[in-house]
């Protein structure tokens, strides 16, 4: 089974757990299948390729005659097919052509939720309609329409799902936006983020707060933490964040191999290690004689395709853009800012209408509408694709986006490894506020920052972050002023990072704090 995102794959894997004969079902992302093809074909350096480059090269391998084992299946299911466009759609078409003659396939999708065709641009490419046409016209598939609603638990939610009928009855985008706005007006209003934060913890089941942009998501995430509501950010589909217990256990291993008995002994003395931890790591690095090869495990995990159960998801209310919530469902959904987005004054596009419909169909039991009231003039820096908060003058910057991957480096030689790792294990939690303090020893062309948690160094930023910040504030810095300090970001998660090994300061595994938020600049 191929699903759209890693989050969706995790959900499907959880539901299959304990199901009879579930071992015969393999759930993967399309990016994961591409990686499998490249690995099997022995393509050099594929691990360092971007996800798009992997897709492109895997497509080339299939067209050149590759017959990968991953496609030796009895039936291939592709979910969320309306969001598979461009070269990913081409890869699916080639994969379907590689199936055995007696194998079947099922493509599942909802055309009303198609929000990625808009990314194809003027040059075009294969959209989901082209994918479906190839499946039916060239590969003998037949289309079947499913009209039932199998998700909604509440009559009002069912009304939201049935809004598709109103959208189908009108062609003009402004009228579609108006129709959705009328439907959303029937749902309870939660007021501001600060207002609904008071009663969200009382809701049973899973809760998601959906926004239109990542800048808004970062702001809402911070507001929830300020209100005392634990929250987590929904990550990009291609982001792989490993659970922290891997580093907590494996960093204690001395030598190149660890057997089951020694591993279980270390795991028993470590918090939050699941009972099946050994089995999960063995799937990532099979090894021999009931042992795990430490270097091989680190190398396999660096590939970015860990087995189910090794990715960190986090707890609390999920804060997500609508795009990142695709393929997921929640008991409760708060949609922030639809009145503004669907207002005729904003001249909503077809993509905005589709996004609104997607958001309305994520909830199963409750849908609440909230207002976007925070007075932040969020802007996106086109050169870096990052969000920032401008000042009164065009060149001013009050806040700047920090992403989870910006601290994807070891803490460095200014922090004793053992002390920093122990401090992360015992004193740092998601939601904690951190400061980014300039590290003048490493700040030359671009700034490097030490990550301080209550004054204690726990990490540092990488060159990508320094280059992005420099692109935004270079004019200010060129006047002779020092680089700014950044305050107000938070720990998004603790994660396991892996390296090539080679000593105490270059281990195979270490804990790393992922930091995110709209950090305030202090000059």
Predicted regions and their residues:
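Conserved helicase motor core of SF1/SF2 NTP-dependent helicases
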Residues: 4-14, 75, 81-195, 208-216, ...
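Conserved active-site motif detector
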Residues: 382-523
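Extended, charge-rich low-complexity interaction segments
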Residues: 52-70, 144, 172-187, 257-287, ...
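Conserved RecA-like ASCE ATPase "motif II neighborhood" in helicase/translocase motors
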Residues: 39-73, 85-95, 320
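Conserved two-lobed SF2 helicase motor
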Residues: 26-32, 51-58, 315-323
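Charge-dense polyanion-binding interfaces
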Residues: 51-62, 231-268, 476-521
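Conserved helicase/translocase motor-coupling segment
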Residues: 192-318, 322
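P-loop NTPase Walker
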Residues: 1-45
């Amino acid at each position: 089974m191929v699903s759209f995102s890693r989050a969706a794959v995790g959900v499907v894997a959880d539901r299959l757990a304990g199901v009879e004969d579930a071992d015969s079902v393999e759930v993967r992302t399309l990016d994961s299948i591409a990686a499998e093809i490249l690995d099997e074909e022995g393509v050099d350096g594929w691990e360092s390729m971007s996800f798009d480059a992997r897709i492109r090269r895997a497509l080339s391998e299939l067209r050149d005659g590759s017959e990968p084992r991953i496609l030796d299946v009895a039936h291939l299911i592709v979910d969320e097919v309306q969001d598979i466009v461009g070269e990913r759609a081409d890869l699916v078409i080639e994969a379907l052509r590689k199936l055995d003659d007696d194998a079947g396939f099922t493509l599942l999708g909802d055309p009303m939720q198609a929000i990625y065709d808009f990314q194809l641009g003027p040059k075009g490419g294969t959209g989901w309609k082209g994918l479906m046409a190839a499946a039916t016209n060239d590969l003998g598939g037949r289309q079947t329409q499913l009209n039932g609603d199998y998700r909604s638990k509440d009559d009002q939610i069912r009304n939201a799902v049935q809004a598709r009928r109103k959208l189908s009855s009108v062609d003009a985008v402004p009228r579609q936006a108006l129709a959705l706005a009328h439907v959303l007006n029937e749902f309870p209003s939660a007021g501001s983020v600060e207002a609904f934060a008071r009663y969200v913890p009382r809701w049973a089941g899973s809760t998601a707060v959906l926004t239109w942009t990542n800048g808004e998501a970062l702001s809402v995430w911070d507001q929830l933490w300020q209100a005392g509501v634990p929250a987590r950010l929904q990550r990009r589909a291609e982001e792989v964040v490993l659970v922290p217990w891997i580093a907590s256990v494996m960093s204690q291993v001395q030598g190149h191999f660890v057997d089951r008995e020694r591993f279980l002994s270390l795991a028993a003395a470590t918090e939050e290690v699941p009972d099946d931890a050994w089995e999960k790591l063995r799937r990532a690095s099979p090894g021999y004689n009931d042992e795990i090869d430490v270097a091989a495990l680190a190398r396999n995990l660096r590939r970015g395709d860990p087995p189910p159960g090794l990715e960190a998801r986090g707890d609390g209310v999920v804060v997500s853009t609508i795009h990142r919530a695709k393929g997921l469902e929640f008991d409760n959904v708060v949609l922030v800012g639809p009145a503004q987005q669907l207002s005729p004054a904003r001249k909503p596009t077809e993509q905005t209408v589709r996004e609104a419909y997607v958001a309305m169909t994520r909830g199963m039991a409750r849908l609440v509408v909230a207002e976007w009231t925070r007075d932040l003039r969020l802007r996106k820096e086109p050169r870096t694709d990052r969000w920032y908060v401008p000042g009164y003058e065009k060149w001013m910057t009050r806040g700047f986006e920090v992403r989870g991957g910006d601290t994807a480096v070891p803490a460095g030689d200014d922090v004793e490894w053992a002390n920093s790792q122990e401090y992360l294990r015992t004193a740092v939690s998601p939601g904690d506020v951190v400061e980014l303090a300039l590290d003048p020893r490493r700040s030359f062309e671009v700034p490097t920052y030490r990550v301080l948690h209550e004054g204690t160094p726990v990490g540092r930023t990488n060159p990508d972050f320094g280059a992005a910040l420099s692109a935004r504030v270079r004019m200010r810095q060129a006047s002779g002023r020092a680089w700014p300090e950044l305050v107000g970001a938070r720990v998004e998660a603790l994660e396991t990072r892996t390296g090539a090994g080679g000593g105490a300061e270059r281990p195979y595994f270490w804990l790393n704090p992922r930091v995110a938020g709209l950090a305030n600049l202090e000059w």
